[in-house]
């Protein structure tokens, strides 16, 4: 999927079934390395990143069958250095490191997804594993790690909140000797889901979802069954789709509790929202959104993965809105494409200022990443005219059947 034709002037209404969380499913798949037991995992989304992760596991010797529900047997792992051509495709491949070290005492991987030390906090992963007793050598963009005997439990104070590093340390500590405490840990729902999965296999983890996670190491893990949580970012994206188009939507098979901050902002924008056990209903019919001031923050704050979508919402809102990005650098690249579509946006340091206009215009735009792809497609749906969105190959990394789901609620999107 390289290029999409998107027809504008659409009001998006209807029902959407939310897929499983990519950000929970990916690490959970890599956590299966920790056990020889047979595992069954449900609600796995069909995404390119997931498929690459499965190829990585199979390369290591893991046996996998099934589709949305996977049966996994990691008892025959016999390779500890995955190939560069797979590791380089997804940043999430860093999560192979902790489980391989914990179970086998050795691992060798290339730096994932073209990451550079310092640009994304890969160094936090390595520092955490070093504190657990691993010896790590970094040379020629390759991480060579080993430990004599078992990893050793430790009190680890994270210098910066990091979802990825919290996952790496938590997974490695499950088989360490003694107890590990991760202080200043990430609190995301995905962390809670991963801990729940590991505990199902026999791990002893308490405190996931708080800033302090305690892991009592065990000798080995067993098999088990787990259902991956719904994707809160996909849910939020569809809610914004309806809000920006002045439509109404019901998202099914989702978890409202994971979206408290997003729902608060949508309500502030003027949407009527109702929630149930596993559904969210949004109604913005006949109302132009009000502008919002947003600052991204670690969970339970406003998610960085939703700021591009809300920039679109601010672009067509009444008033002037701001979005301040505190998690990642260079996350406003997409704004130049919204400006092509008529949006009035100014960038000042790590903040964008959106001067709301009534209507965007169609254009030929280029997406720079996963969330930008979704945002520009939504922009095309509500703009006047036909928009061509290029470089949409990013989309299938994190959204399952996104154009198809949008078409079911009133969009007209075609693959060119």
Swiss-Prot record:
UDP-N-acetyl-alpha-D-glucosamine binds at residues 91, 120-124, 305, 327. The active site is at residue 115. It is found in: Cytoplasm. Phosphoenolpyruvate binds at residues 22-23. One of its GO terms (biological process) is UDP-N-acetylgalactosamine biosynthetic process. One of its GO terms (cellular component) is cytoplasm. PANTHER family: UDP-N-ACETYLGLUCOSAMINE 1-CARBOXYVINYLTRANSFERASE (PTHR43783:SF1). Cell wall formation. Adds enolpyruvyl to UDP-N-acetylglucosamine. This is UDP-N-acetylglucosamine 1-carboxyvinyltransferase. It comes from Buchnera aphidicola subsp. Acyrthosiphon pisum (strain 5A).
């Amino acid at each position: 999927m390289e290029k999409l034709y998107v027809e504008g002037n659409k009001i998006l209404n209807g029902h959407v079934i939310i897929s499983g969380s990519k950000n929970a499913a990916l690490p959970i798949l890599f956590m299966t390395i920790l056990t020889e037991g047979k595992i069954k995992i449900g609600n796995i989304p069909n995404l390119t990143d997931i498929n690459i992760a499965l190829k990585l596991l199979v390369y290591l010797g893991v046996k996998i069958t099934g589709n949305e529900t996977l049966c996994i047997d990691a008892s025959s792992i016999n390779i500890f250095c995955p190939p560069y051509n797979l590791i380089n495709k997804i940043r999430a491949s860093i999560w192979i490191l902790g489980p391989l070290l914990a179970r086998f005492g050795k691992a060798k991987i290339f730096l994932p997804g073209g990451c550079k030390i310092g640009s994304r906090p890969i160094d936090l992963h390595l520092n955490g594993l070093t504190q657990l007793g691993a010896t790590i050598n970094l040379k020629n963009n390759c991480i060579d790690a080993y430990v004599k005997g078992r990893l050793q439990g430790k009190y680890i104070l994270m210098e910066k909140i990091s979802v990825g590093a919290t996952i790496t340390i938590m997974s490695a500590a499950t088989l360490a000797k003694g107890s590990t405490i991760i202080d200043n840990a990430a609190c995301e729902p995905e962390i809670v889901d991963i801990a729940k999965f590991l505990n199902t296999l026999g791990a002893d983890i308490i405190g996931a979802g708080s800033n302090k996670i305690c892991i009592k190491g065990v000798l080995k893990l067993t098999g088990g069954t787990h259902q991956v949580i719904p994707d809160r970012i996909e849910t939020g994206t569809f809610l914004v789709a309806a809000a920006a188009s002045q439509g109404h939507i019901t998202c099914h098979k989702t978890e409202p509790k994971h979206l408290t901050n997003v729902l608060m902002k949508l309500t502030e924008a003027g949407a009527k929202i109702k929630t149930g056990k596993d559904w969210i209903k949004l109604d913005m019919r006949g109302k132009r959104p009000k502008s919002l001031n947003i600052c991204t923050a670690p969970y339970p704050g406003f998610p960085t993965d939703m700021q591009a979508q809300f920039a679109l919402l601010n672009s067509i809102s009444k008033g002037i809105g701001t979005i301040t990005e505190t998690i990642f650098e260079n996350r406003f690249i997409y704004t130049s494409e919204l400006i092509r579509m008529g949006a009035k946006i100014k960038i000042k340091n790590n903040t964008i200022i959106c001067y709301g206009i009534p209507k965007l215009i169609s254009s030929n735009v280029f997406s720079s990443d996963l969330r930008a792809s979704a945002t520009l497609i939504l922009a095309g749906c509500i703009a006047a005219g036909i928009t061509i969105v290029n470089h949409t190959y990013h989309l299938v990394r994190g959204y399952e059947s996104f154009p198809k789901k949008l078409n079911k609620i009133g969009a007209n999107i075609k693959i060119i």
